[in-house]
Amino acid sequence: MNSFSTSAFGPVAFSLGLLLVLPAAFPAPVLPGEDSKDVAAPHSQPLTSSERIDKHIRYILDGISALRKETCNRSNMCDSTKEALAENNLNLPKMAEKDGCFQSGFNEDTCLVKIITGLLEFEVYLEYLQNRFESSEEQARAVQMSTKVLIQLLQKKAKNLDAITTPEPTTNASLLTKLQAQNQWLQDMTTHLILRSFKEFLQSSLRALRQM
């Protein structure tokens, strides 16, 4: 499949993505990055749930690439040798063997729970990214809103919703305050690390979901 253009991000993309929360009685919504003909063109096969999730993740990855480009252009964080020290102060979601998402020991149900839980944990970090960009402010918002939609899509696919852990709002609020109180260098480094880790998490998720 072709990759999406980052120009697809914007207020219109937000609205289209949020249409997914409307009742099923309404016509099938067009996801950000989708062509309407993929959804409702006469005499054509609509995208399956798995295909829509796949396409949606690649759309978000496109947005992350655009945000990383701005981050790298405005600072030297992408080449910094001090990032390991800063990363130790974050608790960004990562895939591990026990999560069942790798080819060895793959477990669909366990992996899906990990993906959804990880995305929910990333939400506070995506909130932190808001107002961290000047020329890509709308893209940062699009990544955040598109991730919320992705979580909804995956929750419909999950069989064991009770196993999904949702972060405590008070914990997230405290973490957000702490991140925003950092000095400028640490804020820039945190932005870089969040984008890099989120990209890696989504790429691992995409590979696992293609096995389901």
UniProtKB/Swiss-Prot annotation:
Belongs to the IL-6 superfamily. One of its GO terms (biological process) is glucose homeostasis. Pfam families: IL6. GO terms for cellular component: extracellular space; interleukin-6 receptor complex. Its main location: secreted. GO terms for molecular function: cytokine activity; growth factor activity; interleukin-6 receptor binding. Glycans are attached at residues 73, 172. Keywords: Acute phase, Cytokine, Disulfide bond, Glycoprotein, Growth factor, Secreted, Signal. This is Interleukin-6. Component of a hexamer of two molecules each of IL6, IL6R and IL6ST; first binds to IL6R to associate with the signaling subunit IL6ST. Interacts with IL6R (via the N-terminal ectodomain); this interaction may be affected by IL6R-binding with SORL1, hence decreasing IL6 cis signaling. Interacts with SORL1 (via the N-terminal ectodomain); this interaction leads to IL6 internalization and lysosomal degradation. May form a trimeric complex with the soluble SORL1 ectodomain and soluble IL6R receptor; this interaction might stabilize circulating IL6, hence promoting IL6 trans signaling. Cytokine with a wide variety of biological functions in immunity, tissue regeneration, and metabolism. Binds to IL6R, then the complex associates to the signaling subunit IL6ST/gp130 to trigger the intracellular IL6-signaling pathway. The interaction with the membrane-bound IL6R and IL6ST stimulates 'classic signaling', whereas the binding of IL6 and soluble IL6R to IL6ST stimulates 'trans-signaling'. Alternatively, 'cluster signaling' occurs when membrane-bound IL6:IL6R complexes on transmitter cells activate IL6ST receptors on neighboring receiver cells. IL6 is a potent inducer of the acute phase response. Rapid production of IL6 contributes to host defense during infection and tissue injury, but excessive IL6 synthesis is involved in disease pathology. In the innate immune response, is synthesized by myeloid cells, such as macrophages and dendritic cells, upon recognition of pathogens through toll-like receptors (TLRs) at the site of infection or tissue injury. In the adaptive immune response, is required for the differentiation of B cells into immunoglobulin-secreting cells. SUPFAM superfamilies: 4-helical cytokines. Disulfide bonds join 72-78, 101-111. It comes from the Eukaryota. Gene3D superfamilies: 1.20.1250.10. It comes from Cercocebus atys. It is found in: Secreted. Residues 1-29 form the signal peptide.
